[in-house]
Amino acid sequence: DETIVQHDQTFNLALHRFPGVYEPRGHKYITDFEYTPTPTITYRVGGVILRKEMLWIHKRTQLMIRYTLVEANSETHLRLRPFLAFRDKHALTHANMEADGHSYPAVNGVKCRLYGSFPWLYLQTSKPGTEFVPAPDWYYNFEYLQDLARGYEGHEDLMTTGYFETELKKGESIIFSASLDEMGSTKTIEEVFAASIARRTHKIDFLSCLEHSARQFVIRRPGGRTEVIAGYPWH
């Protein structure tokens, strides 16, 4: 979840579904969406304009998100709270006493592993001095309407081990990275993001959109074998 903090007031930009209710309702702050070169959402909260660019890194198990404070008239903080499941894609997780809610130091961030049978997940940022506040807790009953409509289980509990918080100045950006591999420095995070977004094609017509979508079905297995996967969008 992303939260804007200004004048000791918090504005949560997230949107979650729980039984019978959507909370928080961050969609009301969305003013723009762009698909190319990478999915980008623009939020406006009063005098604050925040841009969010989401990027899966090619051939890596890594998600990167760049937040840019486009406009602000007073001191503004950004708070980032990751939610963790650590499960198979065909299962849902529920609150339990076995999950390890601790966070352990990593380069400009932390690493987490709820269960010993899973790999470490590295949560890092590109801005030196970003504070991580440990606050482990379970959030209950996230509801997935499409799963319920298909006759599957559709309620899940998610763990948060804490949140990142930093002050952003007008025009300043911060990159959040979630990866199975640790980034060696804040500079590396910036370089990986820049290189990855530079290789993205601009999806401006039917053919370019079709080529982009087709590439998502081509995967490379750990052993180096390249395959075309069926049903990927539904997983």
Regions found by a protein language model. Name each.
Residues 1-235:
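Acidic, mature catalytic/reactive cores of soluble proteins
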